[in-house]
Amino acid sequence: MIQIDQLRRLLGLFLVAALAPVAHAQDAQVTRMRAALAAPDRPAENKARDADRKPVETMQFLGIKTGNTVVDMIAAGGWFTEVLSAAVGPTGKVYAQNPPFLVQADAEKALLARLGNAEPVHVQLEAAGIVGKADVVVTALNLHDVYNGYGDQPGGESAAVAFLRSIYGALKPGGVLGVIDHVGVTGRDNKSLHRMLPQQARDAITKAGFTIEAESPLLAHSGDDHSKNVFDPAIRGKTDQFVIRARKPR
């Protein structure tokens, strides 16, 4: 008859054997990411942002895996596109979505050619045929503009919910939404500061149909008192940011 101690040892060995492939895959992904982010052809200005943006840790928190299909929603200059490209590896796919007015054609072409596993999207995800096919969609430092309104767009919670619903449609059942944005506080003019209340983001995310799984303090910055515009040289690149991971129901 197997004794309790023997059973515990056997169970421990089983768990080690079962988890070893997962740990190996995670180690390989981290090694690949660090190599890609340190590559000599990566722009120095992008590398300089890594210390504050913690790309490897952020990708791990969002649960992005090798081989995933991911969307960088409103990719702008493509810093996150490059990070996502490294995270999913050569067997994965990155869609760098930008509205036409944000497209920097020459820079985008050079970036995507260098990455090899990414392609541009200059229309809404549904129009591009990205429906129910993404494992993860990340929107970084954009939701505040949708919520606060920009250009001739009125903004408000309804605008944010509609934006997030378009992401919901792009995701597979069980897919992940990652939202990163500048923290705003009550009593400030968050529109002019390019910020939003974390609770505004939470409310819009849940009303769009997602379940919030976790939030991370990875990008919190205590030196930001939330009173300055995020483009103020005193805090640019070092703003206090919230990171939310949410999931589309299976």
Which residues does each PLM region occupy?
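Class I SAM-dependent methyltransferase Rossmann-like catalytic core
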Residues: Q29-K65
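Conserved class I S-adenosyl-L-methionine
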Residues: T66-A76
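A short acidic, Gly/Pro-enriched loop at the edge of an enzyme's catalytic core
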Residues: N68, L115, A128-L141
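A short glycine-rich, Lys/Arg-flanked "PGG" loop and its adjoining helix->strand segment in the class I
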Residues: S85-A86, P154-P173
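S-adenosyl-L-methionine
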Residues: V103-V131
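Conserved beta-strand signature within the Rossmann-like core of class I S-adenosyl-L-methionine
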Residues: L164, G174-V183
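Core SAM-dependent methyltransferase catalytic element
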Residues: A208, D225-R250
